[in-house]
């Protein structure tokens, strides 16, 4: 795993462990001033700063501004009696104690401002700080880590319980019974996606240019995709089988799913510096608190956001990387569809393709001459179930379509009635000569009780005319 070719990577192409060519490059992006403001507006800090400065302006106005006030007393009465203007004197507009109102607001807002600055500092310290070489080594481990797509199903129900609580009314304490419901987990199952038959490889990008910026905020996410339809169908089938196997075991089912990388410490956010021992001036703690004490924290945050580059690195795993060769024959049966994975009987009919039901139009146009239609296939037989014919007033509920198809597939005692036998045997020809042709059945009879063609296990061995 060579990592010492940082500056000469353009001369010798790098080969990743899979033996594939160089990955697509991804570089950190330094945002403009407007985009950095939209990304991290810090509107709480801005609002508190504006309110503090507004209250400070009111206090300064109360201390510096003067307004004329009338003189109260005998001098004012003598002046009004002589016909002259009333005597006034300059005074502060907040001289009667109104100065304490904006001072109280300033003190309260300043405390809120310091609390908001403390929360901002804590959030910034939550992201670990590291250098570019450590991040590149971490990315290499993330690329080489095998993925694990997991599912978790928790079956639970609620239990009704009671407890004694003490309440107070009019100074008197009394005990009452409270009824509440508590969740009780009965069973927890976990499963993983088995991708050994399809293979997996990492298709993440190659991160370059971290050392070109003084500070870079790195955000990690992980995802997976499919390189073939077989891998996607296998994932959906395993997922559906897992949750269907754990469904119905209790009153409720909590389903969770996700992905993690094995044998690696995945972090969602990192702060990368070119030299962690001497970070830029706007990223130092003492500068932050010194500027925050002067109520200039918001401009400092804008400068820090503008000087920090951002990059969103996505670790992507591709399932289905090792697809079988074009001439290879699949070893197992085709994958079942997820939409009908719970309908075992329907899936069996679709996969085996043993019963072919003619439509109503095909059943009407079938005549006696169509007996040669089935002579080419010696393994096909046509059967009519006289026991399944509908009575005049059906007394019970109608069977499901799949069950009715199975009942009609078994050969019963054929009686002349709605459907004519087309087996081509002597009994069938004698019946045609002696009995008149009857009218076709009604639509519901033909829909619910069709005439079926049942094939053998090996299928038709004729010239392909047995397909209906």
From Swiss-Prot:
Subcellular location per the Swiss-Prot or TrEMBL entry: Membrane
Residues passing through the membrane, by range: 45-65, 98-118
Pfam name, any one: TMEM151
Chain positions covered by the region annotation Disordered: 1-25, 384-438
GO cellular component: endoplasmic reticulum; membrane
Chief location bin: membrane
Key words of the record: Membrane, Transmembrane, Transmembrane helix
Membrane topology: Multi-pass membrane protein
Family: Belongs to the TMEM151 family.
Name recorded for this polypeptide: Transmembrane protein 151B
